[in-house]
């Protein structure tokens, strides 16, 4: 099961939020570090995530054509519990 940390950029749909995940990759030839970002449709059945919040998402069975990730927990809540 994969887990990713991302930022909620849209929460207009019912039970779905769009999360943007940023990763740093190294260029194969030149070695420069490049920031890449990808947007995931995430299933959020209880509507816990809010716009601009950092959340953890994890893989799950395909829920629809684009939704293969599910809301796991808020990154802010997990940091405060440590």
Curated annotation (Swiss-Prot):
Keywords, sorted A to Z: Chloroplast, Plastid, Ribonucleoprotein, Ribosomal protein, RNA-binding, rRNA-binding
Grouped into one coarse class, the protein's main location is: plastid
Give the UniProt record's GO annotations in the biological process aspect. Answer: translation
Q: Which domain of life is it from?
A: Eukaryota
Cellular component (GO) terms are: chloroplast; cytosolic small ribosomal subunit
Subcellular location per UniProt equals:
Plastid, Chloroplast
Q: Which GO terms describe its molecular function?
A: rRNA binding; structural constituent of ribosome
- State whether it acts alone or in a complex, and with which partners, per the record: Part of the 30S ribosomal subunit.
Q: Which family does it belong to?
A: Belongs to the universal ribosomal protein uS17 family.
- Official protein name in the record: Small ribosomal subunit protein uS17c
The protein's organism comes out as Cyanidioschyzon merolae (strain NIES-3377 / 10D) (Unicellular red alga)
């Amino acid at each position: 099961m994969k887990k990713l940390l991302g930022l909620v950029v849209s929460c207009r749909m019912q039970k779905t939020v769009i999360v943007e995940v940023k990763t740093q990759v190294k260029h194969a030839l030149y070695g420069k570090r490049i920031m890449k970002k990808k947007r995931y449709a995430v299933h959020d059945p209880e509507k816990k995530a809010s716009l601009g919040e950092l959340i953890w998402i994890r893989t799950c069975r395909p829920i629809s054509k684009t939704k293969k990730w599910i809301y796991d927990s808020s990154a802010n809540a997990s940091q405060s519990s440590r």
